[in-house]
Amino acid sequence: MAPAGRGSLRAGLGVSLALFLSAGAGCRGPISAESEVSLRDSVRRALEMEIEKLDASREAQKLQRAAASEDLEIKPEYLAEIEASYDPFNYPSGVEKREILGEDLMGDPPKTVTVGLRHAIRSCVERNLTVQDATLGPAISEASVTAAESAFDWVFFSDLTWTDLDTPQAGPGFIPGLNEVQDSLQTVTSSTGFRRSLVTGGQFSASNEIVYSDVRQTSFGAVPSPNPGTSVDISFQLDQPLLRGFGSDVGLASVRLSRNAERAAIASLKSDLITTVTETESAYWDLVRAYRELSIVQAQLERGLGVREDIKARLVLDAVQAQVADAVATVETRKGDLLRAQRSMRRASDQLKALMNDPAFPVGSEVMLIPSDRAIDEPIVLSLVEEIRTAVENRPEIDTALLAIDDASIRETVAENGLLPQLDLRAQASLLGFDEYGDRAYSEIAENEFLDEFVLGLFFEQPIGNRGAEAEFRQRRLERMRSVISYRRAVQNTVLGVKNAVDDVKTNYRLIEQARATRIAAAEALRTLLVEKELTDRGFTVERLNLEFGQQDALAAAERAEVAALIDYNRAIARLAEATGTTLTRNRINFVVPDANQIEQRERSVSLTTGDAGSEGEDSDSQ
């Protein structure tokens, strides 16, 4: 929520390109040949240069892929059997067969919690430590803006001074023997007033000075009258630069830079949030992959155990000990693969727990997360040109680059003003009053009995050669040119990221069908081998049993490849949303930047409810 008075600052993070056209800069030639028109064109054409070769009129297309599995020409009844028995997504899960999960690090059977993708992302947005850290950035920058604006607040000042002077003086001379006299003076001075810095670069002050004096003089020294007396001075003073330092462009430069820093912090928060949500989604799909691969390895091991027993039974017929040992080695290798798969499952679970930071199952707990969502296999509609335009409109890096151009332009304006000589104006008017008592002195001011004081002055200063100011101006101009190049590079990197993401989505979608066809072919080969094994005597020869081992390995590899292709497709969709800056919209996340007060209230609320929330979540989701 935006603080009062700065709603427009947080209402929208996107920065209009037109805001920076007058301040843009490019670098295509010598500084002396660079014109403002070319600088504006350099910024305006940064996107058009990247997409001008593309056909913008082409409509978005739905992803397509060849039906490679149809080329296998497998009968429908056999295909149904394959899908029922050899589909890695239909194997018994870790919840149904808890023993395949192995032991946790404490040596106990793991306790499981089923987690969906939506819950994982919501927990990440609400609790992830990286997001919490980034959330503080805008609040810190907001305080910096307030501090910069406070430079133009009214300042109240008040001084009080007491002085007691005993000063020896020369004697009057006409009295023999009286060579010196002594003056005694006591004064109390009080000065009170207000002053304020102006956005034009000047300063205005209004002050009231009261001086109470009591003069005592020995011997024949004259004593003033009235004594003691009170003088009053009401003064108004304006100090205003006329050349260097003049104008709101210079006076408000620090405020504008602070506001841009706040916008940059908001863009950084959005970037961190997009990255963290994408990492969480990727970690969830990694968990799905590890979960399915664990089931694949377990199924492969169970098939291998059956073949090993068949080979052992052939010892009385045609098997030799070496063949039995080879079968045992194959099974033991698969047991090792199962241990590695269990470790991968634990690692993927812990990684997702770290990103979620859910108090119900912290990273240190031995609760194992079990994914409840399956990876999608549906085509999406894509248009490269529209994806690029969307990315340029939504990527926070583009906003940051535009803000850098504005910052450089502000600094260049200040440096250009610094080329001028210093010519300052001082105008002062005073109302004076004096009497024995202070109230009478103020009455004299009201009656205008004393002549008022007016001061008008000019102060001029100019460095010989002015090399320092010229060097700084040249530096700021070069920095502005660099900022435009950085903006163009940000656009280029964004376009490159979108193209790579679109390429990954299309390629991985096609790879799903290729991997599925490979898995179906491997499953058909193993199914045929098992049918021959049951119907003929040749199926139980040692050679055919070893061939069955090989077909099992081929099927497991094909199953893992299919799972990997499907997971990579879902991960590519998440990466595409990240590349286009639409991750938050895609996941229905409202991007609202909290202010410092909201953050403090939330932290107090979390500290009071963390313990209760953790125990409730674990009891409700445990398996």
Question: Which functions belong to the PLM regions below?
Answer:
Residues 90-123:
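Regulatory alphaC helix of protein kinase catalytic domains
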Residues 2-13:
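Bacterial N-terminal signal peptides that target proteins for export
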Residues 134, 138-148, 272-299, 306, ...:
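Amphipathic alpha-helical coiled-coil segments
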Residues 26-78, 166, 337-340, 350-380, ...:
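Acidic, low-complexity, intrinsically disordered peripheral segments
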Residues 126-132, 139-154, 191-218, 224, ...:
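A glycine-/polar-enriched beta->alpha junction
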Residues 108-112, 160-236, 370-381, 412-417, ...:
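Small/polar, glycine/serine/threonine/aspartate-rich low-complexity segments that form flexible
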Residues 12-23:
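Bacterial N-terminal signal peptides
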Residues 230-243, 247-337, 350, 355:
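Hydrophobic, small-residue-rich alpha-helical packing segments that form membrane-like cores
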